Amino acid sequence: MARKCAICGKGVQMGMQVSHSHIRTKRTWSPNLQRVRAVVKGAPVRLNVCTRCLRSGKVQRSV
């Protein structure tokens, strides 16, 4: 699935962009996703993983 972490499920968040004159328009915040090769059930698989999961060691990367 696009723009979603395969480990924790973190995805896009919606909100408003507020200008100086308080005009509000919709905008999105995307998670920092990296496409990595990870070991899943003993086989290397390409996954979209957020950087928080990478830094915390929730992903075992393949070489």
Curated annotation (Swiss-Prot):
GO terms for biological process: translation. SUPFAM superfamilies: L28p-like. Keywords: Ribonucleoprotein, Ribosomal protein. GO terms for molecular function: structural constituent of ribosome. The keyword Isomerase does not apply. Transmembrane segments: none annotated. GO terms for cellular component: ribonucleoprotein complex; ribosome. PANTHER family: 50S RIBOSOMAL PROTEIN L28, LARGE RIBOSOMAL SUBUNIT PROTEIN BL28A. Belongs to the bacterial ribosomal protein bL28 family. This is Large ribosomal subunit protein bL28. The gene is rpmB.
